[in-house]
Amino acid sequence: GFPVRVIIPGCIGGRMVKWLKRIIVTPAESDNYYHFKDNRVLPSHVDAELANAEAWWYKPEYIINELNINSVITTPCHDEILPINAFTTQRPYTLKGYAYSGGGKKVTRVEVTLDGGETWLVCTDHPEKPTKYGKYWCWCFWSLEVEVLDLLSAKEIAVRAWDESLNTQPEKLIWNVMGMMNNCWFRVKTNVCKPHKGEIGIVFDHPTLPGNESGGWMAKEKHLETAEAAAPGLKRSTSTPFMNTTDVGKEFTMSEVRKHASQESAWIVVHGHVYDCTKFLKDHPGGADSILINAGTDCTEEFDAIHSDKAKALLDTYRIGELITTGTGYSSDNSVHGGSVLSHLAPIRRAVRAPALSNPREKIHCRLVGKKELSRDVRLFRFSLPSPDQVLGLPIGKHIFVCASIEGKLCMRAYTPTSMVDEIGHFDLLVKVYFKNEHPKFPNGGLMTQYLDSLPVGSYIDVKGPLGHVEYTGRGSFVINGKQRHASRLAMICGGSGITPMYQIIQAVLRDQPEDHTEMHLVYANRTEDDILLRDELDRWAAEYPDRLKVWYVIDQVKRPEEGWKYSVGFVTEAVLREHVPEGGDDTLALACGPPPMIQFAISPNLEKMKYDMANSFVVF
């Protein structure tokens, strides 16, 4: 307490939290009553009478100094009701909670069972970083997606945790005279109820309630109205005529599809058909992430938004069956929560704010809070994140999908933010607007860029990600298609708005000075000098860090020759690249982003002439 506060992590709170007026240092252990008669775990056969008669209180081996391994379910909360209908059964329910162990030991895994311990599901852990001494003093939050119909058939949900010493929790409560250090499986009972007329649901019952509140299944104070009700009937989804589908007779539930959401097995659903895209991961032009971001889901709308008829025909090669869906006889109400319990759980839920892009399969709702016109056709947009204390959570080198409904259809386009990765509460997009009737090959202009340009401040868009096959992890290290790659020199060649992923990497390298020794050689192509995006920043950085960044511009035509253009005019040629980017080698990596003809005819063949290993040292964003 004031004026001195000492925090001793790992020591049990009940023993060590004190407000002190004075401290007395003694040569021997305290003989205070509470030092001996509290915070002890005596053997199960010892009751209060025996403990007093045989002086069990004074045996040092039973004192509590460290917590034991424990875990708790916080979501679903007590008295929460989950309706069973066509809406809720088509998406997973996310269980959440926390776990901890004593002595600074790391929680290594958390498991949930829905069948009384016959089988266990491994949860996704979200641990805090350890201290510099390798200790873990904070709660480890965890989550697990489960099928709603699996919850309906379960009698209870139970959780247990393991720590790095392979300690785990006992199945049943072990009695001791003080009732302390109980760490058996945390169980939440499930019961079928009738929350509304004609509807069934699952109500969740915790063992007890926080503080002095009464309730919970252990107290047996509340009787739930139960109903014998079957799950909604199943019906087969209707086939759609837009694809030339083959006669594949297998049928799959959405629950089965969701199990195939990894690099080892990637299934998707499009228009009621199930496709196994695992073999196509390595060949997808946008990288494996473009498929994995939707693996295990129904991505019909998104697939239609960004794929051509040719791609739709190609998809049919991977068709394995049809989707079985539930009936639609129930309403789509959201879960109903017990309000009193929510107030107790709120601090737990707020304690760790996950990055906005914590789940690549979910869209986040972002509000336009700033819009700046940098030139006739270039805009800088600022979007706020769902929470003001969040970061976007986009790894360096990856990009996001911006999603919007335009003229009644979903439109999705990939963008790389120009804001720093650790910006809190918002992110920035630099967008070149392609207007109608300005390019003969594209008379309608850019659908998404014109839409963004038309948005008033206060409007919302949806964002999804991260996706992409390239990630810069710092100090010359990359992860490319899941494989580690290190480079001390980067050849960065881009055109137009393809500067944004390069800009993100340049920004990361220069922020990590002097530790990051990566050399960057940027060749940036545009139509005119007025089309060069982020030129002020690039020129400033090149002047400030001449040993780290070299910039060379290439334009088709000079608009103002009187200003003395000192860079290249024309195309990105072999001569330009030989002069301004390093030759290929084991420590050199080429990064490219631009229009496909530029990649195919200007960059790839010329880098190959410069001894680049095009399979391992050339990456296209």
From Swiss-Prot:
Enzyme class: oxidoreductase
GO molecular function terms listed in the Swiss-Prot or TrEMBL record: FAD binding; heme binding; molybdenum ion binding; nitrate reductase (NADH) activity
Cofactor list: FAD; heme; Mo-molybdopterin
Textual note on the cofactor: Binds 1 FAD.
Ranges of residues in domain FAD-binding FR-type: 361-473
GO biological process: nitrate assimilation; nitric oxide biosynthetic process
Residues annotated for heme binding in this entry: H284, H307
Swiss-Prot/TrEMBL catalytic activity: nitrite + NAD(+) + H2O = nitrate + NADH + H(+)
Keywords attached to this entry: Disulfide bond, FAD, Flavoprotein, Heme, Iron, Metal-binding, Molybdenum, NAD, Nitrate assimilation, Oxidoreductase
Site (Necessary for efficient electron Transfer) location in chain: C593
Start and end residues of each Cytochrome b5 heme-binding domain: 249-324
Residue sites binding FAD per the record: R413, A414, Y415, T416, L430, V431, K432, F435, L447, M448, T449, S497, T500
Annotated consequence of substituting C593S: Reduction of activity
EC number: 1.7.1.1
PROSITE patterns: CYTOCHROME_B5_1 (PS00191), CYTOCHROME_B5_2 (PS50255), FAD_FR (PS51384)
Family to which the UniProt record says this protein belongs: Belongs to the nitrate reductase family.
Function as written in the Swiss-Prot or TrEMBL entry: Nitrate reductase is a key enzyme involved in the first step of nitrate assimilation in plants, fungi and bacteria.
Subunit structure: Homodimer.
UniProt-recorded name of the protein: Nitrate reductase [NADH] 1
Species in which this protein is naturally found: Zea mays (Maize)
